[in-house]
Regions:
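Bacterial signal peptide processing site
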Residues: 23-25
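Accessory cap/linker subdomain of secreted extracellular hydrolases
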Residues: 28-46, 187-338
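C-terminal motif of bacterial Sec signal peptides marking the signal peptidase cleavage site
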Residues: 18-21
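Gly/Ser-rich "nucleophile elbow"/oxyanion-hole loop immediately N-terminal to the catalytic nucleophile
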Residues: 73-74, 135-155
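Short beta-strand/loop motif that positions the catalytic acidic residue
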Residues: 344, 350-352
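Primarily recognizes the serine-hydrolase "nucleophile elbow" in alpha/beta-hydrolase
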Residues: 148-209
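Short beta-strand element of the alpha/beta-hydrolase
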Residues: 76-85
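Alpha/beta-hydrolase-fold serine-hydrolase catalytic core, especially in secreted/extracellular enzymes
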Residues: 251-285, 289-295, 386-456
């Protein structure tokens, strides 16, 4: 190793010592720095973090930005965060700051937190899992070896967390990278099942509105999202959706035709008005990302055999929507990258808002089926909350989940939905109100929410 590299490593260690200060926690000695990853640098903490928090940040060798936060009285537990989305386009450092600010409760609860922006924009689950593990290695190498590492996946990031756990904490792995997995409002059905309803939205919207694409525009199969090189903007699509459905129009000013069409979309797909445009956006630009960059121009989704109900005239709707068959090669390729296998060898604890309109609560049943089929059903406990928000539930619920998961991972004390609910109530004294857990709730099958269909 060159003297310059040794000096850079020594400088990084000195910076960390200065960051923590004489009165800060005494951390284990860092391991020798790897050749590929530079040490994180002192970084300004986002507003709202607990007093005394120290932050570091950087950009990894793959190009992902990251932030790390260490509370004043760190007890050795690291929460490794996989964010939702995903974002399209190149990574932006601001994303890591936004995530840390949103999940400041983890730092307030005494845990170190680390989150990556992911190096590759778009629906690339396995690549994001590798980015997440790379950040863990940066933490271990340059900061400390945590006593316990919990992998936390939120929304789309839950699929990232599952993929990372399958790869780095599989059953029988002698030294798993993670001690437990926390999943919150997760997209848990993988890419080949979680997005079926968004194809349904595209075909139903086009049947009703006929403006995405318009008749005078180049026609394309709707599973494509958009053709390569298309110039449609989000503002353009929002204007088209408002023209047809009245999404941005006050209810009293909507025409009867707009209201009827919107009523069909909401009733058939079982989604609220407020989520229609977001799902339509995803089924446009994220579908484009998947088809153009992940499946070689082939469709991983289809709606052959799907029977839509809830409209004024179901027979006309089912006869009139466009129908597509999923391509077996695309399903296999996209599934390998994005579908969970369930082969996770450490405890998994999930929470899901039962009225989540972004990631349906019924996805929890799909996860349960997958994990049980892999022989790991005893490693999964699922909890549910009386919430409709997707991005964040409430402050006390996450420390409660963490405490229960740590007891399971460290002492073998497997939680139950009831024990998590009790713990949450106890946490309200410290973290404020917000416990709405439903210990007796069970999620229905995904097919009760999304029309079953033929699959390759």
């Amino acid at each position: 190793m060159s003297m310059a590299r040794i000096m850079r490593g020594a400088g990084a260690l000195l910076a960390l010592q200065l960051l923590l200060g004489c009165s800060g926690p005494r951390l284990p000695s860092p391991l020798p720095p790897p050749l590929a990853e530079a040490a994180p640098q002192v970084h300004e903490c986002p507003a709202g973090l607990a007093a005394g928090t120290r932050c570091l940040g950087g950009q990894d060798s793959a190009g992902a930005f990251y932030l790390i936060a260490i509370p004043r009285d760190w007890g050795g537990v690291l929460v490794l965060h996989a964010h939702g989305g995903p974002e399209l386009g190149p990574p932006k450092a601001e994303r890591a700051a936004e995530d840390l600010k949103r999940w400041a409760i983890m730092v307030k609860a005494g845990y170190a937190w680390a989150g990556s922006t992911f190096a590759q924009g778009g629906v690339a689950v396995s690549a994001a899992a590798a980015d997440t593990e790379r950040l863990r290695q940066i933490f271990v190498t340059h900061i400390a070896q945590p006593t316990t590492t919990i992998l936390h996946g939120q929304s789309w990031g839950a699929g990232v967390a599952l993929k990372a756990a399958e790869r780095y904490a599989a059953p029988g792995q002698p030294r798993p990278a993670y001690d437990g997995v926390l999943l919150s409002n997760g997209v848990l059905g993988g890419g080949t099942r979680s997005y079926d309803f968004r194809l349904d939205l595209r075909v139903i919207y086009q049947y009703l509105c006929g403006n995405h694409p318009r008749p005078d525009e180049a026609q394309y199969p709707l599973w494509m999202g958009l053709p390569a090189g298309a110039t449609l903007t989000r503002a353009d699509l929002a204007a088209r959706a408002d023209s047809c459905l009245g999404l941005a129009t006050p209810v009293p000013k909507r025409t009867p035709e707009q209201q009827a069409r919107l009523h069909t979309v909401v009733n058939v797909l079982q989604i609220p008005e407020r989520s229609v445009l977001g799902h339509l956006n995803w089924a446009t630009w994220h579908f484009q990302d998947v088809v153009q960059k992940r499946t070689g121009g082939l469709s991983p989704w289809g709606n052959i055999g799907a029977r839509y109900s809830g409209s004024i005239d179901d027979a006309a709707l089912n006869a009139g929507v466009q129908r597509y068959a999923a391509d077996a090669r695309a399903v296999t390729q996209f599934g390998l990258d994005s579908d969970p296998s369930g082969r996770v060898g450490v405890p998994m604890l999930s929470v899901h808002g039962v009225y989540d309109a972004t990631a349906f609560v019924e996805l929890e049943s799909q996860l349960r089926r997958t994990v049980v089929a892999a022989g790991q059903g005893d490693r999964l406990v699922q909890t549910f909350s009386d919430d409709g928000e997707h991005s964040y539930l409430s402050d006390p619920v996450y420390p409660a989940l963490m405490a229960e998961l740590l007891g399971w991972a460290g002492r073998g004390e497997k939680p139950s939905p009831a024990s998590v609910a009790r713990r949450c109530q106890a946490m309200e004294a410290r973290f404020g109100p917000g416990c709405r857990l439903l210990p007796n709730y069970q999620a229905a099958e995904l097919e009760s929410r999304v029309a079953p269909r033929q699959r390759p």
